[in-house]
């Protein structure tokens, strides 16, 4: 019979979560199952992380290479929604939390756990994202945070690791809090908490200095129904597309973001992000939508995209509202197929060409040269009807002395 007295821990392999394994067992009396996902963050192999978890006292270690799943089911949804929270942030961390939560719940069911633990503090967004996502999938599971709920501070961690002779090699602590995956990289805390302090070179890893770029890089990205399927004529999966654009756009310094952000928990925070692949792909996707979406559909989608980004940022990935928006966004993508040519250089991703069999751009209607098929005489009647409400309202304003004033002096 499965043991229902276990805790599933979101395990990164670092000091915090390595200490948390034994600390949770000691404080709660429950065995701990460590869960680790590869979402393209780089660093140590899953096997190395698995063995460390077991050496630190985990009774089971559940590891998953989720890179393709993350790219296909999460990054592509963000791409189709042109997701940019507050106009600039491509939801680097926010879209990974629902995927991690799904695997935490799966592990809880598999190993008979009744509690899920994460390593978030009590003032960040991720605690909400994990716990709301977990509750949305299985509301019977309890969620805890050792840092928030059990007073597991860094000083306690170091002392605990020494006392219990845990197999952890402590390296010099970075002054920053960093979260990264294939969609991008988030950097915060340390001296960046003073919003007047400019970022230093050591903040960045995914991008080179845009002030000293190599020769410009021209790239052609082909989309099929909103998803990148080819780069420069070569077939790519979503994961391969993101990885290649990370390399190429990152080399040009594309995707550096520095902003004061409105957090879900109500405070403002200073955040740095690097998302070269995400920024380049979203720029290309938006331009293809400009060609392929009907005007009113496009206007509505821009509003929907903004709201989608806010909902996902605010821990609502699994909510009914987000699912409804997903259905609308997916329907808009059936004609978003074609090619976008971009130049990557000096921190910018600039579209220089676009073509699509499903484009609504009609050269014969748009041209001012011979061959123009647009009947300009039709504009007279259109303007009469379109301007009718304004003329009627203006007549009323004049009647009541509220007409728009015009300059009385004559022009010499």
UniProtKB/Swiss-Prot annotation:
CDD domains per UniProt: ASS (cd01999)
Residues where L-aspartate binds: 121, 125-126
Enzyme Commission number, as recorded: 6.3.4.5
UniProt GO BP: argininosuccinate metabolic process; L-arginine biosynthetic process; urea cycle
Any one GO CC term of the record: cytoplasm
Keyword Nucleotide-binding: yes
Lineage top rank: taxon: Bacteria
Keywords, sorted A to Z: Amino-acid biosynthesis, Arginine biosynthesis, ATP-binding, Cytoplasm, Ligase, Nucleotide-binding
Binding positions for L-citrulline per the UniProt entry: 89, 125, 129, 177, 261, 273
Top enzyme class: ligase
Subunit structure: Homotetramer.
Protein name per its UniProtKB record: Argininosuccinate synthase
Lineage: Bacteria, Bacillati, Actinomycetota, Actinomycetes, Bifidobacteriales
